């Protein structure tokens, strides 16, 4: 009756976050660490062509499958990377 409050639009803030692409770096070979090689945390098989998610790596196949379902990662529940930068890697040693 007289107690109705105007509803604010909470989706406006989520739309602004959704529109901005998440940028990540593409790696042809995994970085070696003290604890061994990095693998795709979803399928555990791929160790090449990895994409860095928030705190883990995903292969291109698993990333595409997750992006078809939603914008969130199934492992860490953060936004999946949508824009990938490929660094130029030398094909031969410098002379």
UniProtKB/Swiss-Prot annotation:
Alphabetic keyword roster: Host cell membrane, Host cytoplasm, Host membrane, Host-virus interaction, Lipoprotein, Membrane, Metal-binding, Myristate, Viral budding, Viral budding via the host ESCRT complexes, Viral release from host cell, Virion, Zinc, Zinc-finger
GO BP annotations, alphabetical order: symbiont-mediated suppression of host cytoplasmic pattern recognition receptor signaling pathway via inhibition of RIG-I activity; viral budding from plasma membrane; viral budding via host ESCRT complex
Gene3D superfamilies listed in its UniProt record: 3.30.160.310
Quaternary data: Interacts with protein NP; this interaction probably directs the encapsidated genome to budding sites. Interacts (via RING domain) with polymerase L; this interaction inhibits viral transcription and replication, Z partially blocks the product exit tunnel for the releasing nascent RNA product. Interacts with the glycoprotein complex; this interaction plays a role in virion budding. Interacts with host eIF4E; this interaction results in eIF4E reduced affinity for its substrate, the 5'-m7 G cap structure.
One of the record's GO molecular function terms: zinc ion binding
Subcellular localization(s) per the UniProt record: Virion; Host cytoplasm, Host perinuclear region; Host cell membrane
Role summary: Plays a crucial role in virion assembly and budding. Expressed late in the virus life cycle, it acts as an inhibitor of viral transcription and RNA synthesis by interacting with the viral polymerase L. Presumably recruits the NP encapsidated genome to cellular membranes at budding sites via direct interaction with NP. Plays critical roles in the final steps of viral release by interacting with host TSG101, a member of the vacuolar protein-sorting pathway and using other cellular host proteins involved in vesicle formation pathway.
Name of the gene this protein is made from: Z
ZnF endpoints (RING-type): 40-76
Span of the annotated motif PTAP/PSAP motif: 90-93
Domain remarks: Late-budding domains (L domains) are short sequence motifs essential for viral particle budding. They recruit proteins of the host ESCRT machinery (Endosomal Sorting Complex Required for Transport) or ESCRT-associated proteins.
Protein name: RING finger protein Z
Membrane topology note: Lipid-anchor
Family that this chain belongs to: Belongs to the arenaviridae Z protein family.
Record PTM: Myristoylation is required for the role of RING finger protein Z in assembly and budding.
Pfam family, one: zf-P11
GO CC terms: host cell perinuclear region of cytoplasm; host cell plasma membrane; membrane; virion component
Lipidation (N-myristoyl glycine): 2
């Amino acid at each position: 009756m007289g107690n109705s409050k105007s509803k604010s639009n909470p989706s406006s803030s989520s739309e602004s976050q959704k529109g901005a692409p998440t940028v990540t770096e593409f790696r042809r070979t995994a970085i070696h660490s003290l604890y061994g090689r990095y693998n795709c945390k979803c399928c555990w098989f791929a160790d090449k062509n990895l994409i860095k998610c928030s705190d883990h790596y995903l292969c291109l196949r698993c990333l595409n499958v997750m992006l078809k379902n939603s914008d969130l990662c199934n492992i860490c529940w953060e936004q999946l990377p949508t824009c990938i930068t490929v660094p130029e890697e030398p094909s031969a040693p410098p002379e």
